[in-house]
Amino acid sequence: MLKSRKFWAYEPCQAFELKEELFDNYKMKGKFNEDVQYFYDIIGIAPHPCFKLKQYKLDPQKEPVELQSIEIINSKIDINTLKIIFYMLPSTKIYNMKFISNDWDINNLEYLINSLLERPNNIYYLSYEWNDKLSINGTNVSINSEEGKTDYADYFNKEKNLIYKLIKNSKLEGLCLRGDLLGDEAAIRIFELLEKNNTIKTLSLYNNNLTPKCFPAFCHMLLFNRKLEDINLGKNFFDDECIANLKDNLGKTAMSQEDVVEYNKKVKERDAIIKANAKLKQQKKPENEVPFLYEMMMIQDQNYLVKNKDLKIINLMLNPLTDKCYDSIINIFDNCPDMFITIDNKVLSEEHKNSFFDKKSKYFDKIYFSK
């Protein structure tokens, strides 16, 4: 036990070892603040500020508002605070965790991700924002610095692998990676993993140094992902050509009669595989892979191949777009009537902007112009 300290501090709390048997042998009192205080008393230090963010009273006559979110902003997180958080989580209604500008120790970050995946919790929304620096040997190193790209590259590669692991295995519905400067290669891997992800509905990759290099992977992901509804790609380097390519991977595409014949042929082939797999399953033999087919639907005697109709919101603000993207945006709205897009106020000409302000237009209120 440390000499009692009035205020929480990272170094002494990080250096102390809260052993697992302390948690195993403790019988919770059912009062959040008292249970948290017990472990910090053992350390001999005040609780981390994150435990007080939402513990306020709206009315002196009423009970404190129950904690539903853990938010750690502009503060480091020691290993013992993480242990206490995950010990307390199953007995709370906390569903949201926000970690913003924390200068993580990579081992602490690994503990966080592994605990999210392996320990009981009800976390469905995670923000890991503006964390472009890691604390390495007592020094904060940026992912974009020369040292971050050379001497300490392994640390940042481990950080990225932890993010991939989270996307691949967790039950998260919302993930915010804003301002982490992850880069194209990381984004490509994230999009690849999202092809098979069936939980994440909202994703922010705002300000991640993304260029047109990773955009084909984003478009390809849209062909397979059927869960993502809202993506923030703001403050990157996507251009007009990216938007032109995007329209081919959203909504519906008209089919010719030949297309319909070919599609029906593939449906029969797929159904035959499914039928054969049922027998293989009974025989406990390996099943064959079932080919993926898009949905076909008919609208007013015209058949359409339906691609991604689930994505509803795209934020493209602070990207180097020009008025040339107008036709592509219109095509996206034609293919996806429920789509909503955000771009900068200065991207489109006044004439083109006005087309979205006409209440009689089908494009009215489909776009937000950020200032």
Q: What would you call each of these model-derived segments?
A:
Residues 1-371:
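Leucine-rich tandem repeat or coiled-coil scaffolds
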